[in-house]
Curated annotation (Swiss-Prot):
Its EC number is 3.4.24.-. This is Protease HtpX homolog. The gene is htpX. It is a multi-pass membrane protein. It is an enzyme of class 3 (hydrolase). One of its GO terms (cellular component) is plasma membrane.
Length: 291
C-alpha cells in the first residue's frame, strides 16, 4: 500500500507545483480572449500530467526512504538483516533482476517495493513484519515485492497515472473556466480569467485527482493478484504466500476475518474503491484456485 499511496501523494503535489509554476511563468497559453483553446489545453494537460507522473517516479525511492525512515542495509548488523539481504538476492536472481537495495524501517507489519526502474529499485520491510511472521512467510512477502519489480508495476503505474493526470487537468480547467464565466460580470469584456478561475482550477484539480485515484487503485488491485502469483512461482509453492496473507490479517489457517485493515487490505463497501489491495479472502482464493 505504501508504494501506491506515496506515489499518488507525490504525484498530486508535483502536479500542483507544476500547474502553479506554469501560471507564474505564463506558459499556460490555452486561455485566449475568445475563450479556451482546446488544442493548446490538451497539450498543456498532457505535458503537466505526464511530467508530474514521471517526476514522481524518479522521486519514488527517495520519497519512500524519507517518509518511512527506512535504512538501507549496506552492511548487515545482525543475522536477520543478513538473511533479508541474502533472501532478496536469491529471489532477484530467480526473477532475472539486478539486486535491489534492501531497507528496513520501524513500523506495523508491512513491506513495499519501489523505484524508477527494474535496475534501480528498493525493497523495504518493516520491523513489525519481521517480528510477526516466520521466515518462510517473510520470504513469501519478499517474493511478492520482487514480483512487483519483475512485472514493472511502477513504470506501468506511471503511464496510467500520466493519462489520468491529463484528464484531471483538462477537466479541471474546463470546470474552472465555466465557474469563472458564471461569476464574471456581464460588463466585463476583458476576456481575462478572474481570481475565481485560479482558485477553482486548483480546487477542481485536487477534487478530480482524488476521484481519479479510483482508476489507479483499480489497476493496483489487479497487479496485486499478479504479484501474488509471481511470488508463488518464485517460491516454487503457493502455501507460503497463502500463509503470509493469513498472517497479515491475523488469521488462523482456514479462517477468514470479517474486517481487514492490515497492509491496505480492503473489505467491502465504497471504501474498497480507494484501496490499493483486493480483499484478503479474494487473494487467498485466487492462489488456492490457481492451477
Amino acid at each position: 500500500m505504501k508504494r501506491v499511496v506515496l506515489f499518488l501523494l507525490t504525484n498530486l503535489a508535483v502536479m500542483l507545483v507544476l500547474s502553479v509554476s506554469a501560471r507564474i511563468l505564463g506558459v499556460d497559453r490555452f486561455l485566449t480572449s475568445n475563450g479556451l483553446d482546446m488544442g493548446m489545453l490538451l497539450v498543456f494537460a498532457a505535458l503537466i500530467g505526464f511530467g508530474g507522473s514521471f517526476i514522481s517516479l524518479l522521486m519514488s525511492k527517495t520519497m519512500a526512504k524519507w517518509s518511512t525512515g527506512a535504512r538501507v542495509i549496506e552492511r548487515p548488523a545482525n543475522q536477520d538483516e543478513a538473511w533479508l539481504v541474502d533472501t532478496v538476492r536469491q529471489l532477484s536472481k530467480k526473477a532475472g533482476l539486478q539486486m535491489p537495495e534492501v531497507a528496513i524501517y520501524d513500523g506495523a507489519p508491512n513491506a513495499f517495493a519501489t523505484g524508477p526502474s527494474k535496475s534501480r529499485s528498493l525493497v523495504a520491510v518493516s520491523t513489525g513484519l519481521m517480528q510477526s511472521m516466520n521466515k518462510k512467510e517473510v520470504g513469501a512477502v519478499l517474493a511478492h515485492e520482487v514480483a512487483h519489480i519483475q512485472n514493472g508495476d511502477m513504470v506501468t503505474l506511471t503511464l496510467i497515472q500520466g493519462v489520468v493526470n491529463t484528464f484531471v487537468i483538462f477537466l479541471s480547467r474546463l470546470a474552472a473556466y465555466a465557474v469563472d464565466s458564471f461569476l464574471r460580470r456581464d460588463d466585463d469584456e476583458s476576456g481575462s480569467p478572474g481570481i475565481g478561475y485560479w482558485i477553482s482550477s486548483i480546487a477542481f484539480e485536487i477534487m478530480f485527482g482524488i476521484l481519479a485515484s479510483v482508476v489507479v487503485m483499480c489497476f493496483s488491485r489487479k497487479r496485486e493478484y499478479r504479484a501474488d502469483a509471481g511470488a508463488a512461482a518464485l517460491m516454487g509453492d503457493r502455501a507460503p504466500m497463502i500463509d503470509a496473507l493469513r498472517a497479515l490479517g491475523g488469521l488462523e489457517a482456514g479462517r477468514l476475518p470479517k474486517e481487514m485493515a492490515a497492509s491496505g487490505i480492503a473489505g467491502g463497501g465504497m471504501m474498497a474503491l480507494f484501496s490499493s489491495h483486493p480483499p484478503l479472502e479474494s487473494r487467498i482464493a485466487a492462489l488456492e484456485s490457481a492451477s
